[in-house]
Curated annotation (Swiss-Prot):
Its main location: cytoplasm. Gene3D superfamilies: 2.40.280.10. One of its GO terms (molecular function) is RNA binding. This is SsrA-binding protein. GO terms for cellular component: cytosol. PANTHER family: SSRA-BINDING PROTEIN (PTHR30308:SF2), TMRNA-BINDING COMPONENT OF TRANS-TRANSLATION TAGGING COMPLEX (PTHR30308). InterPro entries: SmpB (IPR023620), SsrA-bd_prot (IPR000037), SsrA-bd_prot_CS (IPR020081). It comes from Zymomonas mobilis subsp. mobilis (strain ATCC 31821 / ZM4 / CP4). Belongs to the SmpB family. It comes from the Bacteria. It is found in: Cytoplasm. Required for rescue of stalled ribosomes mediated by trans-translation. Binds to transfer-messenger RNA (tmRNA), required for stable association of tmRNA with ribosomes. tmRNA and SmpB together mimic tRNA shape, replacing the anticodon stem-loop with SmpB. tmRNA is encoded by the ssrA gene; the 2 termini fold to resemble tRNA(Ala) and it encodes a 'tag peptide', a short internal open reading frame. During trans-translation Ala-aminoacylated tmRNA acts like a tRNA, entering the A-site of stalled ribosomes, displacing the stalled mRNA. GO terms for biological process: trans-translation. The keyword Cytoplasm applies.
Length: 160
């Protein structure tokens, strides 16, 4: 069985990645969303700060909100600086929001941010995935598969 490959969005500079999510969740569908940010948040992201490791997205009242994402205050900001962990509105088409709403209403499904990046036009984008939490035995299978691939590469390298 071939591995599931997510669609490739045009990413010019990846700012933050949720690498743990690939281990904890099985992804089903991917979306690209814009973020409604303030000026100091954009400046802070351009300096390479920001984390989406413990964040998730919530679909409520026809809107998608990014919860618990950390974008630190801009170092040269003044009294207009932003709150680091405030909820941020995600910009998606209505059709995509409805699809997310129906997917999340099923048991065990959630919306997880996978990566935060600037696209080629300089806009901050967030790659979202509709995901199902993995069970412990699924995580073990992932570890075994990764170890086997590493061993294969080592064997091929040593023989050649």
């Amino acid at each position: 069985m071939a591995a599931f490959r997510p669609p490739q969005f045009k990413k010019s500079k990846i700012l933050a990645e949720n690498r743990r999510a690939r281990y904890e969740y099985a992804f089903e569908d991917f979306y690209e969303a814009g973020l409604a940010l303030t000026g100091t948040e954009v400046k802070s992201l351009r300096f390479g700060q920001g984390s989406i490791a413990e964040s998730y997205a919530e679909v409520k009242n026809g809107e998608v909100t990014l919860i618990n994402a950390n974008i630190p205050e801009f170092s040269h900001g003044n009294r207009f600086n932003h709150e680091p962990k405030r909820p941020r509105k995600l910009l998606l088409h209505e059709r995509e929001i409805r699809k997310m709403q129906t997917a999340v209403s099923r048991e065990g499904m959630t919306v997880i941010p996978v990566s935060l990046y600037f696209n080629n036009k300089g806009k901050a984008k967030l790659e979202l995935a509709i995901a199902r939490g993995k069970k412990t035995h699924d995580k073990r299978a992932t570890i075994k598969e990764r170890d086997w691939k590493r061993d294969q590469a080592r064997l091929l390298r040593d023989k050649g």
